[in-house]
């Protein structure tokens, strides 16, 4: 029996946590796998993973996290899903000698301090979500040799009646949707607001819906004051109902590891306008399954929205091609790749300071 300990100590629930959840659930459907999950007590993952699988045990923890290192004692291998988890795993393995791997989900520069370097050099393997993240990792340390395993589609549930009610509420509107944390330096929502302002007078039938919350919410709302073609709808658990109701999905990020919500939009056969940054061009080919624009360019965003609004046939072609691409990102495929990686790590020579084979 392979006993994997997943560690995610993130405070909220964003794309990385959704991907953690998807992988855990997909691994739970494999034979001879048991899983532990170490998360913060207040993490939404506690509720989302409760009762999922008889071979899954949850361990909600509070600070200081290292006091809970005993939970890794009987694990074959630790799987790190974000930065704080990496520090926890590195220190816990000094005590219990368990190997760990890291999945890196963001393209941000990695901190150049002694502890962080030890965290990465101490990992048996590093996984990147995209080639863009892989380049960040190899620039940081040429010895890391990351493996690329991309994000997964979420296969979000849809209530057809709820989706139809959304369409009815915005009848005669062309719905341009966006979903993401309202953190402008990352997701670039100010460019959606600016595009909405540019289109409002001549194209009032184009209506923008932004789903999410975050530290820049009030600032963005002040920026959008006076616009009657844009609404902020907070974070919604029923994202699938909205994706099914949208006509177009926009994602003007300033940097992005891959943008897993784009895979969800693709699965819903939505035409997409997104920034040409990070790992996004690895899943969206301009003119084939979406449109790519330069980051920070609200004019290009508005022009692309208007172009697709006017060209229904092109929207349909982009959307269908996007759906076909999304078929390559099923969680079961990622789970199988991770299982092979887990077994490769456990059957090979351990790094100095780790010894467990499970």
Task: Walk through the language-model features, giving the residues of each.
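Aromatic "clamp/platform" in nucleotide-sugar-dependent glycosyltransferases that forms part
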Residues: 235, 254
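Short His-centered aromatic/hydrophobic patch
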Residues: 80-86
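A conserved mid-protein helix/loop that constitutes part of the nucleotide-sugar donor-binding site
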Residues: 14-25, 183-198, 215-218, 291, ...
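A conserved, positively charged/aromatic
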Residues: 72, 100-128, 140
């Amino acid at each position: 029996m392979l006993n994997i300990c997943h560690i995610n100590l993130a405070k909220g629930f964003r794309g990385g946590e959704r991907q953690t959840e998807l992988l855990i659930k997909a691994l739970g459907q494999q034979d001879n796998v048991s899983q532990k999950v170490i998360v913060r007590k207040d993490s939404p993952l506690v509720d989302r993973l409760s009762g999922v699988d008889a071979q899954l045990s949850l361990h909600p923890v509070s600070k200081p996290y290292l006091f809970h290192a005993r939970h890794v004692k009987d694990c074959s291998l630790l799987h790190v899903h974000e930065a704080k988890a990496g520090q926890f795993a590195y220190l816990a393995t000094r005590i219990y000698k368990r190997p760990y791997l890291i999945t890196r989900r963001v393209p941000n520069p990695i901190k150049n301090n002694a502890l962080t370097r030890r965290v990465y050099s101490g990992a048996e393997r590093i996984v990147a979500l995209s080639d863009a993240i892989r380049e960040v990792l190899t620039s940081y340390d040429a010895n890391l040799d990351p493996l690329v395993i991309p994000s997964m589609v979420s296969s979000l549930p849809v209530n057809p009646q709820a989706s139809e009610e959304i369409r009815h509420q915005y009848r005669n509107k062309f719905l341009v949707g966006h979903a993401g944390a309202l953190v402008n330096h990352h997701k670039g929502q100010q460019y959606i607001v600016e595009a909405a302002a540019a289109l409002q007078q001549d194209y009032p039938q184009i209506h923008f819906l932004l789903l999410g919350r975050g530290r820049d919410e009030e600032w963005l709302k002040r920026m959008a004051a006076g616009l009657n073609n844009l609404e902020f709808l907070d974070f919604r658990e029923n994202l699938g109902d909205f994706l099914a109701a949208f006509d177009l999905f926009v994602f003007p990020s300033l940097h992005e590891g891959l943008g897993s919500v784009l895979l969800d939009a693709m699965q819903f056969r939505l035409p997409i306008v997104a920034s040409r940054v990070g790992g996004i061009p690895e899943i969206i080919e301009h003119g084939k399954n979406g449109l790519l624009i330069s980051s920070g360019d609200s004019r290009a965003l508005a022009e692309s929205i208007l172009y697709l609004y006017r060209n229904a046939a092109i929207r349909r072609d982009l959307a269908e091609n996007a759906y076909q691409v999304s078929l390559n990102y099923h969680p079961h495929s990622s789970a199988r790749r991770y299982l092979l990686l887990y077994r490769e790590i456990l059957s090979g020579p351990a790094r100095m300071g780790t010894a467990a084979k499970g």
